[in-house]
Structures are given as structure tokens and as C-alpha cells.
Amino acid sequence: MKTLIENVNIINLEEVETNQNILIEDNVIKEISSSKIKANANVIDGEDNYLLPGFIDCHAHIFAKGFHKEENMANPLGLHFYNAVPHALQTINAGVTTIRDCGSADLSFKLAQQRKLFIAPKIQLSISPLVMTGGHFDLFLPSGWDMEIIYPGFPKGRCDGVEEVLKKTREMKRAGADFIKVMASGGVLTTNSSPEFAQFNKKELKTIVKEASANDMKVSAHCHSLKGMNNCIDAGFSSIEHGTFIDKKTACKMVKNNVSLVPTLLVHQFLYENGFPAWDNYASEKVAKLKEIVKVHKENISVAYDEGVNILMGTDSGVIPHGHNLEELTHLVEIGMSESQAIAAGTVKAAEFLNKDNLGLVKENYIADLILVNSNPLDDVSILSDNDNILNVFQDGVLVK
């Protein structure tokens, strides 16, 4: 199968190559030329439009629908899986062709995407995050009921002590994980859990990293806490998710140790502005936590950016509705990034972090994961927040929007 996009403007980082012709053959960008390309192909007129790499969301939860686990207890388990189908389409329609799922998706989704059973982003899996007893996302209720979903092929993540975290790391690998996610601080959505408190001890964290590294897997930390971030950096983690209370000293330490930051600025702002369902008995507690986080998050991430921390685009989609992914780019610009740097955080920089050396740029011999938009996001990246401005999405050379 061949597709020819004619007279299109190509965006790679800060560069705009005008009036280019691009031949896509099978799943690869075969040729880029300013001259006409002769080919027996489906032709798309790209005049006055802009072609970018498909975006990579480095922090998503494709199965999640607000993480209202009470609904999972009330509904048939099958709905948990079927929800992922519209979530996947919403993600594609937002211009995201690859996601890094930080907890909830299983191997079945990855296989279904690879087999093209439905339109969906490519995915890197963490399966279930590792969480200590009483920690963030330990879903035990005061009643004693456990809301954590488990089924064959999807192990629980709760673990304590060196031996248990070692075994759970191996179980996630066995279940199909591409990387390991660890809840290394308290969070907003879990009651009786403060974002400022570190979770898991240093021996546990180092054990997780040692075992993951032996399997060529990176380890990622949900972490708001300053102490928690330092524990994770010392243990050898590859990324910090959220990083709310980061300071200059810790940012410098991240740079020195090549630790990336996925700030997910969108999620806290979105939740703070839109609130929680009326039936959520813990809504007031969550809003109080959000108030503290929103107050300092952007300011602190701006410090991290100024110190040279490698910042990647991630949204926590699933905690908030899917399909808002590229709104994160506007928040990245607000912390000091240029439009091109924000775009790079969700394309070439994200691809490098995922060890995908053939993604993230519009270049010959790269995988044809691409989006066509109706105006230049280097002038105003917020145009990517409106999914109507994303005219076409290609994944592996196939037109999926």
C-alpha cells in the first residue's frame, strides 16, 4: 500500500520544510522530495497544511475511566476492557499514535493493537503499578473490601519488603510489562495518603531497579514527594512522573543521573477546575490536595526545566477524559518551553526515551506515524488542543483518521 502526500509543509523540531512531497510505502516514509514524486499511490493534497510526527503520550491509562473503582465493582468485568476501545479512538483522534501506559492496561490490548482488531495507539505496558500496603493505590476500603482488579494474566501490585518487590517485578515482566511503574509517594486520588510523603524504602526501590535492569526494563516512579524523588534517583529510576515538589537541587541531581521528568501538568489543573463526581465521598479531601499541588506544580517544573531536566509529554489520561492529550503542550509552553521544545517533548524526545530510534521525526526510513494539521503549531502550539485541527492521523502508514 502506498500513500503520497503532496505540497505539504513538514515540521521537524524548529525547521519547516515547505511544499514537500512524501511517499509512504507500507509502514515507512519511503521518500521526501521537493520535486514531484511519481507513484501509483493514494494521493492526499497537503497544500497549506503541516505534517508532524505522531505524538507519544508518556503517561496514560488507556483502560481507566476516571479511576472510579467503585464502578468496576458494580459492573461486569468485561466493561473494563470494552471501555478501552473508545478511549483508544479518542487518543488517536487527538493525534497520539503511541502511549506509555502507567497502569491498568494488559497484554491483551497490546496484542489487539498489533493485530489491528480496532484503531488504537501503540502501547508500552507497565501492567499493574507496584504499591506498598497502605500506599497510593492500595485500594483497600475502610470496610475491608479490596477494589483492586485482578484476573488471570493481571497480577496485583501490592507488595512489601525486598522479597515481595522482587517477586512482583518478575510477575509484571511475566505478564508482559515493558517497564515497571512504582508508586513512590502518596497521591491525590488515594485517601489517607499525602503526596508529600515518600513510599517504599531505599532497599525495596533498589531491588526493583536491579531486577528490572537485569531484564532491560526501565523503572518509573509516580512521585510528588521531594524525599521520594531523591530515593528514586539514588536507586536508579529512569523517570519521575508528576514531580510536584521538585526543587533546584533535585533537578540538578536528575540531570546528573539522566533521569527524565513527566510532569503531567494537565491532569491536576483539569481535576481542580472540573472537580469530582457528586457521589465521591472523598471529593473534598482530593480537592484540598489538588489546591496545594496546583499552587506550586508549574512553578517547580519551571525550575526543573531551567536546570536542564529532560521533560517529556504525559497527561495522565484516564484520570481525566481521554482525547485531551495535546492540551499538555500548552502547559509545557507556560513553564518556559518554546513551541518546538514542547512538540519535541511529545515526539522525538519521547521516542528517544522509549528507545524507538525510528519514531518521532518526519524523515526517510522512519515509521510513518504522522499527523496532518491545518495550521502551524510553531506559531501557536495551542492549536493542537483542538482535535478538529488535526485533519489526518497515520499509523504505520495507514490512515486512521
Regions found by a protein language model. Name each.
Residues 8, 346-348, 364-401:
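C-terminal cap of metal-dependent C-N hydrolases
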Residues 164-261, 291-311:
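Histidine/acidic residue-rich metal-binding segments in metalloenzymes
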Residues 1-38, 49-51, 377-384, 398-399:
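N-terminal metal-binding scaffold of metallo-dependent hydrolase/deaminase domains
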Residues 83-109, 120-129, 173, 177-190, ...:
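Divalent metal-dependent hydrolysis catalytic cores, especially in the metallo-beta-lactamase
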